[in-house]
Amino acid sequence: MKDFLSLASRRQSDRAFDPQRPVEKEKLQRILEAACIAPSACNSQPWHFIVVDDPELKNRVADATSNRVLGMNHFTKQAPVHILVVEERPNLTAGIGSWIKDKNFSHLDIGITAAHLVLAAEDERLGSCIVGWFDETKVRKLLDIPSGKRVLLDIVIGYSTQPDRPKKRKDLKEVISYNRY
């Protein structure tokens, strides 16, 4: 448990990458394997990962991710890899469960697989950042994603040039209770 807590504590959202240093295919493969073994409601695995490492296409995806008006996400241009997470249709059991319980289990599952992915990246000593703010229509068009599919996340990965920073978290007493709220 000590090793896992160390890994989780070390992982941060990195927003500065070495654009000249590519991510090794072997590392990327292990990261994707870790993401694919994440648990999901009724084992539906409602995700598809599109790995963008072609420099020209990556820059076009980064353009769709950054916002000039708000000054957001310009760092995505530096990242050598973008992993787009596309929501797939859940299996019948998970879909019915989502409807009955009024919870989108697919979105929860994608959050879990994203956590696996970024922790695996950290274990490979790679920086990552989960980006949810992007022009989904542009991304869908760039990557030939069918119109009925949702692109939920763009996870950028690369060798971080950002220094480690201390975690700012609420005190455990604020977020944990036992037996009652």
Q: What does each model-identified segment do?
A:
Residues 35-36, 83, 89, 98-142:
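Small-aliphatic-rich amphipathic alpha-helix that forms the alpha element of a beta-alpha
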Residues 33, 38-39, 45-50, 116:
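Short beta-strand segments
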